[in-house]
């Protein structure tokens, strides 16, 4: 039954990783290749993620460089970047497409902080759901006589400790992301 706590710990780690990935997609003052993760390009008629059709680099702190593997598809890549909601206008530089990220306004920064809080809360909800399911499994095992009450209480305390550590980690990630967003 201690296996339940280990499984919960693994699921909670995945929740933290998912939250980190969500945070990577939130814009800050600096250019970050993860900002382009959600962009899909019409590549030979099929919708394809941008990272599968081009290399993405950061030549300057506020500039992303996108170089399509197939130069004949540069127009499709440029169109996908133009249609995205990044707020940056792509410009051609030979076979590369440069995206200069505009400075964030104070209002836009606050919107991104709100979005980060929402993503962190989603992570916490997932952690609480994992805890609830594990607690139900432990309570059922105690009720069915598969383990004693003392063992059940010990596992619940261990589960609470893991849950608290995970939510604290999510809070720390949120605080760091907020600081990064508000940095001018």
From Swiss-Prot:
Keywords: Cytoplasm, Protein biosynthesis. Coiled coil: none annotated. Its main location: cytoplasm. This is Ribosome-recycling factor. InterPro entries: Ribosome_recyc_fac (IPR002661), Ribosome_recyc_fac_dom (IPR023584), RRF_sf (IPR036191). It is found in: Cytoplasm. One of its GO terms (molecular function) is ribosomal large subunit binding. One of its GO terms (biological process) is translational termination. HAMAP family: RRF. Pfam families: RRF. The lineage of its organism: Bacteria, Bacillati, Actinomycetota, Actinomycetes, Bifidobacteriales. The gene is frr. GO terms for cellular component: cytoplasm. It comes from the Bacteria. The keyword Protein biosynthesis applies. CDD domains: RRF (cd00520). Belongs to the RRF family. The keyword Iron-sulfur does not apply.
